[in-house]
């Protein structure tokens, strides 16, 4: 690695952000399977996109069709999956985007490792805290049924632990309230930390 030197671009993150009229950030949605991470992140992205913001959503299932298609579900492979996603998200934030990611990411160590790659304020942890009982009742992919039968090893929440965040920037239980109000809570937070400029709020009403 001693012969590999980081090449400084002539256009930096601040310049890209000014062009887009937004402050780049990574929102990291974490929670159990079926908690509503992808649904919530997708609804927020739609709202921001329709207001003219430049966004991208990284989804746990989608990245395994390409970027991480060579990885399985062992502990080592899951760690590598999140490492890759964290690096891609970092590049996207550097490009000036508002990036949303929806991954179970069950351990605090994994999430803290990704947070450490970003400057203060550019990593926002959103704990989608929907209870296991609700997630299992929803079971949109039938994974909990398989896990209860022992057909899926190391399934988070059943045969493998989920470590809830200790100090997430936001905590949302999707079993309480409706999707629109949950999205507005996220938008209010992004406004408060100046990711969203006040002169563009009208289009989010």
UniProtKB/Swiss-Prot annotation:
The active site is formed by 105
Entry GO MF terms: adenylylsulfate kinase activity; ATP binding
Similarity-based family: Belongs to the APS kinase family.
- According to UniProt, the name of this protein is Adenylyl-sulfate kinase
UniProt entry keywords in alphabetical sequence: ATP-binding, Kinase, Nucleotide-binding, Phosphoprotein, Transferase
Keyword Mitochondrion listed? The answer is: no
**What domain of life is recorded for the organism?**
Bacteria
Annotated PANTHER family: ADENYLYL-SULFATE KINASE 1, CHLOROPLASTIC, BIFUNCTIONAL 3'-PHOSPHOADENOSINE 5'-PHOSPHOSULFATE SYNTHASE
The EC code for this enzyme is 2.7.1.25
Q: Name one GO biological process term.
A: hydrogen sulfide biosynthetic process
Q: Has keyword Lipid metabolism?
A: no
Residues noted as binding ATP in the record, renumbered to the chain: 31-38
What is catalysed by this protein? adenosine 5'-phosphosulfate + ATP = 3'-phosphoadenylyl sulfate + ADP + H(+)
Pathway(s) per entry: Sulfur metabolism; hydrogen sulfide biosynthesis; sulfite from sulfate: step 2/3
**Any Pfam family the entry gives:** APS_kinase
Q: Its function? A: Catalyzes the synthesis of activated sulfate.
